[in-house]
């Protein structure tokens, strides 16, 4: 949900003329996170997707468990209409990995490699912020899905003035922090605020 103010946050470097893109003598694609992100590699055997929370132009977000904790998993589509934009979006989102703020979702782990069964450009595991978005609160909708037996119930009624002020202050605090780090949120909308 955030983009670094620099033009491209991808660690990819274009090769010089005559060099192979993935290194001399290498015929297989080896994709790794940059060294400063190596600590957050995904342990795939510990990840269990539970249900789809939402999807958009660049990918899908799932509720999942990772090492026993409830998390949100964002998978960026490989076959998106704009592959370069998808890749830049993935790497830009990882720019928040170093940030620590109460109003910014933390990244737990990430990977550019995925199991063969998944057709994704990359996967980001984030802290789980809950089932209910600001969109649900504003419009008083009770569920993310139509099934009232799901655990996706949003327990809020309509948004009061006091709640609106609290939400507004939290949103502004998070945005001010991101802006102080030269990061701009490019998809700010009630459905993306938990």
UniProtKB/Swiss-Prot annotation:
* Enzyme Commission number(s): 2.7.11.1
Q: Does the keyword Nucleotide-binding apply?
A: yes
Q: Which residues bind ATP?
A: 53-61, 74
Record-linked Pfam families: Pkinase
Q: Record's superkingdom?
A: Eukaryota
- SMART domains recorded for this chain? S_TKc
Cystine bridges: none
What sequence ranges are listed for the domain Protein kinase?
47-194
The keyword Kinase appears for this protein: yes
Instruction: Give the UniProt keywords, A-Z.
Output: ATP-binding, Kinase, Nucleotide-binding, Serine/threonine-protein kinase, Transferase
What the record says about family reads:
Belongs to the protein kinase superfamily. Ser/Thr protein kinase family.
Q: What is the protein's name according to its record?
A: Serine/threonine-protein kinase mos
Source species of the chain? Dendroaspis angusticeps (Eastern green mamba)
Gene giving rise to this polypeptide: MOS
